[in-house]
Amino acid sequence: AFEGDNGLYGDLRSGHVPSFSFIVPNQCNDQHGRGNGGATCNFDPSSNGTQAGLNPALIYRGDVTLQRLVQAIWASPAWKVGDNAIVVWWDENDYSLAPNVNKVLLIVYTNYGKHGIQSPILYNHFSLLRTLEGVFGLPCLNHACDSNVEVMSDLFSR
């Protein structure tokens, strides 16, 4: 849970957070704009001004949720101690045509490295897995150590 003294924001305020956190937003806050049918999280099946049934308010809500979360992490005492990183990675591609198909946006914020880096390396989802496995000294899962999977060292360097 994000809210309350026992939730994520409480942990961030206290500075007591785990070494690794994997945060996945719910359907109301995931920027897909589809929602779950709840009273405050509606999917709009009509085409009257919406983007093919997407609810623009839910896309905005996801943007605000992400902004609030990143700001809370930056304000946390935990962010100021040691080497920390925030990785924001979307799971949808940009629908680009060949030869640049299936590009997804990845943003890495660190409290220690260079800022404004734009990597020329084409990474995939296994690249993040391989990078994390290396950081934590874990064995490779699935295809994370295939020869075509790059470690994201340029995005986490000093």
Question: Positions of the model-derived regions?
Answer:
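N-terminal pro-sequences and low-complexity stem/linker regions of secreted or lumenal proteins
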Residues: 1-158
